[in-house]
Amino acid sequence: MARKSLIQREKKRQALERKYHLIRQSLEEKSKVSSLDDKWEIHRKLQSSPRNSAPTRLHRRCSSTGRPRANYRDFGLSGHILREMAHACLLPGITKSSW
């Protein structure tokens, strides 16, 4: 189980990313069609925004354990929890393959 402080930190990053998403998106679109001087100004504005507002700072975490690695997007679970739940028949439509 991940520490609760790490999970809270990730939630704070998600909130910041949602708050600054439209601002960052509009600045990035403007920088594609702007002159060099305007691009420097836009770059400075992007740099002045909070670091944790960038979408690359987000991690997907397991919904049951909070583990940040080996996550399956379709289920929102880490690999070993997915395997345990599949063996316990808690995931509908998931069966162990045999051939």
Swiss-Prot record:
Stretch list, region Disordered: 46-67
GO biological process: translation
Domain of life of the organism encoding this protein: Eukaryota
UniProt GO cellular component terms: chloroplast; small ribosomal subunit
Cellular localisation: Plastid, Chloroplast
Keyword terms, alphabetized: Chloroplast, Plastid, Ribonucleoprotein, Ribosomal protein, RNA-binding, rRNA-binding
Pfam families: Ribosomal_S14
A GO MF term: rRNA binding
SUPFAM superfamilies in alphabetical order: Glucocorticoid receptor-like (DNA-binding domain) (SSF57716)
Main subcellular localisation: plastid
Residues of the signal peptide: none
Function according to Swiss-Prot or TrEMBL: Binds 16S rRNA, required for the assembly of 30S particles.
Subunit structure, interactors included: Part of the 30S ribosomal subunit.
Family, per entry: Belongs to the universal ribosomal protein uS14 family.
Matches recorded under PANTHER family: 30S RIBOSOMAL PROTEIN S14, SMALL RIBOSOMAL SUBUNIT PROTEIN US14M
Protein name: Small ribosomal subunit protein uS14c
Species this chain originates from: Pinus koraiensis
